[in-house]
A protein has these predicted regions:
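A short, structured active-site edge motif that brings together acidic residues
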Residues: 63-73
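Catalytic-core regions built around general acid/base machinery
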Residues: 22-35, 94, 98
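Substrate-recognition/cap helix-loop segment adjacent to the acidic, metal-dependent catalytic center
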Residues: 45-65
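HAD-like small-molecule phosphatases
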Residues: 71-148
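Asp-based phosphoryl-transfer active-site loop
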Residues: 3-18
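Substrate-recognition element of Asp-dependent hydrolases with the DxDx(T/V) motif
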Residues: 28-50, 69, 106-113
Length: 148
């Protein structure tokens, strides 16, 4: 008997229209009724997962969510952070510098500012749209070294 099922959202649980099929909803309901813990997992921020958590009624103190590609794990019912692995401002600045050298776009999720980028770009726009987030344009060099 399984005790826990972790489901990736994009490309797995969600179809190409970003919808949970009725078949998947029924299977999740059946698993939960059998006492299996169902965990949604995603590279998305929590805000970008909330509507699916609500749709599946994943909201009790026995429910967990894994987001930001696993860097955050949270008990949904109690809001307790179970795991947190984030980069600081010093690392973010180093990554942004390297991205500039390579001519790559960069954006990050800041606990203080939300979705941040130095220059708005199509990739950041897509990230913002998918997750329902506002974008803050800012110079990464202005982040304090201990900024999360």
């Amino acid at each position: 008997m399984y005790k826990l099922i972790a489901l990736d959202m994009d490309g797995t649980l969600l179809n190409s229209d970003k919808v949970i099929s009725e078949e998947n909803k029924q299977a999740i309901t059946k698993a939960r009724e059998a006492g299996v813990t169902v965990v949604l997992a995603s590279g998305r921020p929590l805000e970008g997962m909330q509507d699916k958590l609500d749709e599946l009624n994943i909201n009790s103190d026995k429910d967990f969510v894994l987001y930001y590609n696993g860097s955050m794990v949270k008990n949904i019912g109690t809001n307790e952070i179970i795991h947190q692995q984030i980069i600081d401002g010093k690392a973010a600045k180093k990554i942004a510098r390297k991205a500039k050298e390579l001519g790559a776009y960069v954006h990050a999720f800041s606990q203080e500012h939300g979705l941040i980028t130095e220059e708005n770009n199509p990739y950041t726009d897509i990230e913002a749209k998918i997750n329902g987030l506002d974008v803050t344009e800012m110079n990464f060099e202005s982040l304090s070294d201990d900024h999360a």
